[in-house]
Amino acid sequence: RQMCIRDRDTTQRDTTRKKSFLDDIISGKNQDSLYYDVRNRTVYIYNQGDINYQNMNLKGDFMRVNMDEKIIYAHGKRDTIDGKPTVTNPTFTEGAANPYTMDTITYNIGSKKAKIKGVATQEGDGWLIGNNVKKMDDNTIHIQDGKYTTCDQTDHPHFYLAMTKAKVIPGKKVVTGPAYLVLE
């Protein structure tokens, strides 16, 4: 007696839909142009870009969205009008938190964490200003080389509490490392 064995593929084809890298839709608009680099899966947005994703909003004059890394990068624009330098900086808002104005931001859509350079945001009756800031997924922010002031001039405050490092829980408290008062 002979046995016949057929080669059969026992694995079945996966019919489940592949999960998108996003949990929701990114919507946006811009004043000038939008360029999509298909090879690198990166979108470049120029001039007054405005991106919304879930409860996050980011506005800036230049933005780069990397689909593979789930990263949005934004920076401001320096311009000269009538010989006076004009700066338009990105603004970032998440949920009901106060907006952040900054020089640059690198925001991870997946983890909801961000690295921010040159940030200013209103906290209580004053302003928190930081050179190097990390925003965590629970909206706490870690500031290195920070300032807290009630002076209206956030670019160059006349007086401030200088903080070598700080942790901010928005709407609740600010915990600092070594801090000292500066009067100019």
Where are these regions (language model features)?
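Structural signature for solvent-exposed beta-strand/loop edge elements and short helix-capping sites
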Residues: 6-184
